[in-house]
Amino acid sequence: MKNTILKIFNKRVLIFTLCFEIIVIVMTSMLGAQDISLQKNIISKNKINYGTALELHNRGKYLEAYNQFTNIMNTEDDMIIRDYTIYYGAKSALLTNMYNEAIDLYALLMKEYPRSSLYPYAEQYKALTEFYRDDYPISNFFNGKSQKWIKEFVGIRALRDTDDTNKARMIAYELLNRFGLSEAAIYYNNNFPEDISSFPNNLKFKTATILYEAGYRKASLKHFQYLYDNNAYKASSTYYMARIKQKSGDRRDAAALFDEYLSNLNNKSHRRLGLYYSADNYNRLKNYEKSIELYNTFLKEYPRDDYVPRIYNSFVTLSLNRNNLVQAKTYLTNVMKRFPKSRYTELALKSYLRKAFKLNNKTETYFATKALEARYPSFRHDFALSWNMWTAEEFGDIEKRDEYLMKTLLTSKSHYFIKGALSLANNEMIANVQLSNTYYLNEAKRYYADSNFTKSMQMLNKIQFLNYIATGKEDNITREARALAKNILMHNRFVKDLYANRSEDDLFNELSLQTRREVNKAIILYYYGDYDNAYTEFDKIFKKTQVTYPLFYFAEKIFKDSGNTKRLIQVSANIGKYFGYPYSDNVDLLPDEFRKRVYPRYFDEYVVPEAKYYKIEPAFVYAIMREESLFDPKAKSWVGAMGLMQLMPTTAAAENKKARYRYNPLDLTDPKQNINLGVSHLGWLFSSQKASNYILVAASYNAGSGRGRRWKAEYGTNNMYRTGRFIDIEETEYYVERVIKSYEYYSKYYKD
């Protein structure tokens, strides 16, 4: 009896405690939200506040900023962002050489806010400030007890900041010798290259390797050659020298060095890649027998390695170069069986398909298209349908062509593939699709009347908007389908909120409650104009929080104003997942407010006038920009293409010679410069191709005008979708598909 009473009592206490905690959370959240709900109340009304102090800091007026930050710290204002106030007060003091004051503030932040996102930065900068205050105690610091990441940070910052070359040299040596940091190696190479020659051999080899990895091949070759000549680290130096020669195009020298390295079976460190790169090198020297021999050695010694599918892809390519389809097919079927999901298996299959088609081998072409269809049962299935349709068209197999044409018209949601099919379709086919549309619309209405919204949406998703895709104009079925879809979506809270025109303070109150006030810091920082830190704080919350409309609303504001448009597109690209819309490939069915978030337009003030000047549709420019960079002005590719339209520096420099531009300095991260020069380059491509073929221009933009002219010569411009289908570079083929699909959406969702 006593135990029973005790259990009941404990249970009631637990329930009471939980209820009380929930009430406290709700009340404090509501109170917190109410206190700072409106923008005019969310920040301090005082003339001196975080925003005014931060503006002074950003303008380089560090002493004034320090005074304002410290004044704010002594008031009750902006307590939610007090850690930021302390941090920037410390940073302002550091930049004014007020080292003790900065150290005290960094220490205060670390003591009061151990869980702040600024804590590790405070720890770093406190150590750096102490290093400066104590006049660069290099030996004591690097031999001290600080953690490795602290030493690396302090060393790199001090190396960048000091004007004393002796101190810089000593710091660089510590960073290079202890941690192997590339910036230290590059510093030595650029400022004291003769010092590297006097390094001990172990450090010399480390430095040479770092320089090689950083792209300083010529400098690293000199040091590897020294080590090779002096019989120190000879095996590894031989390998690296071979790679440098190979990358610089000295293939015969590279072959001799690879042979020397591989001839000694005790050389294990780089044998795996040595075999692979040596085989590739001999392949490019057209010594196919030696290349195959080395590839086979690799397969024998490393049968389960990740490079095996690459090698089979190379075998297929080698066989195709000899027009030997039989041998190529043997390798292809082998790799398809052993590595069915590998990207290199797919590359081998597509290479085989293109070669069989060019050789007019119908049987093998159909073998490959069938394999491609099996590889894409759902995702990009219309890509495989397109190959089947166009190859059948080329071979004159009308029945087969029409089969895949109808499959495309009935199932694809890509304007690119549908317009390609429409270019070959007849009126009877289109009429059949319209009959299908009528049936599915009636079924959708029936399910809607029964409140079976899931099934109704499934039927709507089967409707094909052929007239809209072909002309950009909605017919009755399209309008009805989209209206019904909107009615269904309006049952979701996210969609309701978007159309409710709720006030910003109301959205903030709900979001503050949803996140237990965690979002408040990011919102305050945003309203003070501290967009970068607002983004950092907000994105952490976004990643771990269920996406409601209030969260999405503030994400749009903060991500856009902080310049993180790429991140905004990433969270908007499949916006339907936030309100239960599972058909991410069917953007047409969504209401305009959502379609335009999937395909947004940024930088209108630059795009529209420049596009009109060159008589290019703005929609095409937006499509290029979206697929090149996701509207990220600072984007940089692995080959060096930069900015919104991913211009190569040489291309940009050529366009910048026009009297219309001549930017000085040329800055490809500047949106205006990048867009203007990119649109100018598009104008040149349209002019040089002498065709209004958007597919050909997109392909030329990606792969170069020379290849564009070759494709034009091979396939003409009468049907640009035919041209796009037979582009024989994998990356460009997919690039064109994405760009033209985006162009079709932009041209329909926006009317200039």
PLM feature segments, named:
Residues 31-70, 74, 79-85, 178-181, ...:
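N-terminal leader/linker segments that initiate helical-solenoid repeat arrays
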Residues 39-42, 72-82, 109-121, 141-152, ...:
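Short solvent-exposed coil/turn linkers within tandem alpha-helical repeat scaffolds
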Residues 51, 88, 125, 153-157, ...:
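"A position-specific structural signal for the A-helix of alpha-solenoid helical repeats
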Residues 56, 93, 130, 159-162, ...:
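Residue at a conserved register position within TPR or TPR-like alpha-solenoid repeats
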Residues 62, 99, 135-136, 165, ...:
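TPR-repeat structural position
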Residues 323, 359, 396-398, 419, ...:
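Catalytic glycan-binding domains that act on GlcNAc-containing polysaccharides
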